Design a protein with these regions (language model features):
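Glycine-rich helix-loop-beta junction characteristic of Rossmann-like nucleotide cofactor-binding loops
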Residues: 92-97, 119, 147, 169-170, ...
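Conserved S-adenosyl-L-methionine
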Residues: 118-125, 196, 223
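N-terminal auxiliary segments of SAM/dcSAM-dependent transferases
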Residues: 1-65
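S-adenosyl-L-methionine
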Residues: 129-178, 183
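C-terminal substrate-binding/active-site "lid" region of AdoMet-derived donor-dependent transferases
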Residues: 184-255
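Conserved SAM-binding loop of SAM-dependent methyltransferases across substrates and taxa
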Residues: 109-122, 192
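Conserved SAM-binding loop and adjacent beta-strand
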Residues: 3-4, 74-87
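Conserved class I S-adenosyl-L-methionine
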Residues: 97-108
Length: 293
């Protein structure tokens, strides 16, 4: 659990009256300046999370610890990071559970890696591949700055297009999660290292990428319940009796494709997010396993 008070060396956010966030890494003796307004880091260190602080010139701001979503949007990046709206969906639709063994590629700036680590918990394991040294370095710094030492992360400078290796214990992965330009090239490797009943998930931004990914899943002959979707996030303005959608929204960012590894020879599309029956009118499956005639 984090300390109740802001600590020296911690990365915090200062938030102004318009809701704009400014990232600050606290360092005793330093001075923070914003548009001519100043505040000593010493005046922020040991403040309670959520305190109102006053900069020179009388400018008031909130000093808060960033949420995970805040941190992702403000952290240094090499590769483009996933938006929080997509990061929030991935642990749910990939069914990432405490104790799961997850393979990820590519690491990028580390946002998805952190989301997976938070979901698997200390008893789980995340193995992540990143081919580019500069991206791997940025991701490592971002992860350490936000999460500290993470002993259940195995970060390797490998190219997933060339293959996926199990760890020395030979235990297959429960989940495979890909954020790569050409995930269809990795589908055969994922089929080999994913346990039966395990879940495959990939994120891509365009329709042609989705088409090639789903075609590869079908060709592999061991994936079923395949589903592709996107999510659109729209905030609302609520000011007294004036309630309306905001003029701007985070619309299309990419597509998530999810599939289950199953016994070879069965192919099916997934169910709709609303439930197992398309129109909601079908009777639930019999628990005793008897067929209806």
């Amino acid at each position: 659990m984090p300390h109740a008070r802001l600590q020296n060396g911690e990365r915090i956010h200062l938030v102004d009256a318009k809701g704009r966030h400014y990232a600050v890494t606290l360092k005793a003796g330093d001075l923070y300046q914003l548009s001519g307004h100043k505040i000593a880091h010493d005046a922020l260190i040991d403040k309670v999370d959520g305190s109102i602080v006053t900069l020179s010139g009388g400018k008031s701001m909130l000093a808060v610890r960033p949420t995970f979503g805040d941190y992702v949007l403000k952290m240094p990046r090499g590769a483009q990071v996933l938006y929080p709206k997509d990061l929030a969906l991935i642990p749910m639709w990939a069914d990432i559970y405490p104790g799961a063994r997850v393979f990820e590629a590519g690491t990028g700036s580390g946002a998805l890696t952190m989301a997976l680590l938070r979901a698997v918990g200390p008893r789980g394991l995340v193995v992540t591949y990143e081919a580019r040294e500069d991206f791997a370095r940025t991701a490592r710094l971002n992860i350490e700055r936000y999460m500290g030492a993470v002993p259940n992360l195995v970060a390797l400078r490998n190219n997933a297009y060339e293959g996926i290796q199990l760890l020395e214990d030979g235990v297959p992965f429960d989940r495979v999660v890909l954020d790569l330009p050409e995930p269809w090239q990795v589908v055969p490797h994922a089929a080999r290292v994913l346990r039966s009943g395990g879940i495959y998930l990939s994120f891509v931004p365009t329709v042609p990428q989705v088409q090639q990914t789903v075609a590869a899943l079908q060709h592999a002959a061991v994936f079923a319940m395949v589903e592709t979707f996107e999510t659109l996030l729209r905030t609302w303005s609520v000011q007294g009796r004036s309630v309306r959608p905001d003029h701007r929204m985070v619309a299309h960012s990419g597509f998530l494709t999810v599939a289950r590894k199953v016994e070879s020879g069965f192919w099916s599309r997934g169910t709709t997010p609303s439930g197992p029956e398309e129109d909601g009118s079908a009777e639930p499956a019999e628990e005793n396993g008897k067929d209806e005639t």
